[in-house]
Amino acid sequence: RSRRQRQMCIRDRYGSGRKARSVLDDAREKVASLLGCEPIEVIFTSSGTEADNIAIQGLYAAGQTNRIISTDIEHPAVRDTVSKLEKTGAAVDILPVDRSGHIADLSVLDTLADVATCMWANNETGAIQPIEEIATRANATGTPVHVDAVQAVGKVPINFSDLGIASLAASAHKFGGPRGIGLLLAKRSPAPQPIAYGGGQERGIRPGTVDVAGASGLAAALEESVSEIAAQGERIAALRNKLRDGILATIDDVVVNSAEPCLPSHLHVSFPGADGDSLIMLLDSFQIEASTGSACSAGVNRMSHVLEAMGVSEAEGIGSLRFTLGRLTSAEDVDYVLAHLPEVISRARSV
């Protein structure tokens, strides 16, 4: 089918419109089969951020307790949404995490809330959270659970129907699909109230013209990534472990912040005595791209809210790096990093 057909309005009754509708239906059914849900539960969005906003704001609006449960390690898409609702009157209770970045206490789930929101896997450390336990505990009180699975979809097996959660967000570019397209899996009951209004597309939960080409690309990428979860997970984990072990063997005073259960793609490491900005610039001089665990506020570097929630010291947090590996990462790439990283750390610590 041509890209032009995919760009036609799915509500048009002429031939190309019907073909566009068929492409969208195929994409929806494929996503449903891959993620273990019904096609009607698949809602296409513009991003994972939009999906998180629809779910959290929509489930909160549908509730009556004015209470939200979340964590202190969420992505800004969730963290800022919860903060906005708190400023408008929501009471927010936090699921605490331990030093490994995993949720350590589920007791706040024992009281009913309008929504409990938790990421499946952390974008900085890769820590995988006990989603099944969270859902079971929340379901006992009737609290709907939303899961930000942007980091997890395509990397871990997911069966939405078996999880017992109300909604789940994902973004295509995180599993090799096009940018600008995401998805929200949402049960018919409890369903999020719409936070925008218009043409009534996507069950009225996400009104607006659907990006049919994007949805088709999302479904194709998801099919490929899901088929490779086991093989790629094993390969990437081996490379991640090689990188971790090499760092520990060649550099003194290193703190590994990524702890199992963890995504195979993530390695978060602290180098006390080094500054994150210096690390990034020095790595860039060798064409090595990594992320710092700190954030910039008014020109002053500070460690991320994720590390703060974990209880990481300031010295460790400021000098931290996140390495992410993927399907294109090779053993030669890891060897190259290990060949240059000791020099980078030494120079950064001497600044």
What are these model-derived regions, one by one?
Residues 93-154:
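Active-site phosphate-binding strand-loop segment of PLP-dependent enzymes
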Residues 15-16, 222-245, 255-263:
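Structural signature of PLP-dependent enzymes
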Residues 57-112:
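PLP-dependent aminotransferase-like
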Residues 1-10:
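Single conserved hydrophobic/aromatic residue that forms the stacking wall/gate
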Residues 18-32, 37-65, 74-81:
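Conserved beta-loop-alpha segment that forms the PLP phosphate-binding cup at the N-terminus of a helix
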Residues 267-322:
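Conserved C-terminal alpha-helix-loop-beta "cap" of PLP-dependent enzymes
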Residues 302-351:
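PLP-dependent enzyme catalytic core of the Aspartate aminotransferase-like
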Residues 162-220:
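Active-site PLP attachment segment
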